[in-house]
């Protein structure tokens, strides 16, 4: 509608700005994370879906059963309360069978808790973010390591 002149955009959501990668996350990184949490979590979800796709390809190469993982793929990147009850057993089975995906889902929930814990001080939240980044980089999962590096490059 904007291209034909019927509407005019007055406000646009801010985009996540990426700068130089910092050695450790600081308060500015935390502010950028909280301000752009939807974009950050969408990027994380893309990483989870890609890891799941890679896992399916690996299983297909070995002629293993991929039905459980395919059924759970849709729900792996969602919050636990958003997953329907009939999908819970498949999701639990897929997480138990694939520890890398389970680690990514667990780390996603830990990252989400950073902006839900409003009772903690900025210093404590920054320390939690630094610890999260360190655990993500030491996990041995390439997608988590890349996401952590990208997160440390975020700026407000």
Where are each of the predicted segments found?
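Acidic/histidine-rich catalytic cores and adjacent linkers
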Residues: 2-32, 38, 42-156
């Amino acid at each position: 509608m904007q291209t034909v002149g019927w509407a005019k955009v007055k406000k646009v959501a801010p985009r996540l700005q990426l700068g130089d990668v910092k050695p450790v996350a600081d308060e500015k990184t935390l502010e950028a994370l909280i301000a752009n949490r939807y974009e950050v979590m969408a990027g994380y979800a893309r990483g989870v879906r890609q890891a799941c796709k890679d896992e399916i390809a690996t299983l297909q190469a070995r002629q293993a059963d991929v039905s459980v993982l395919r059924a759970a793929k849709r729900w792996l990147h969602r919050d636990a309360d958003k997953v329907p009850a009939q999908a819970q057993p498949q999701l639990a089975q897929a997480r138990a069978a694939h520890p890398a995906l389970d680690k990514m889902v667990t780390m996603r929930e830990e990252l989400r808790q950073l902006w839900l814990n409003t009772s903690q001080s900025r210093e404590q939240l920054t320390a939690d973010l630094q610890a999260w980044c360190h655990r993500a980089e030491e996990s041995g999962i390439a997608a988590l390591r890349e996401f952590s590096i990208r997160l440390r490059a975020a700026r407000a």
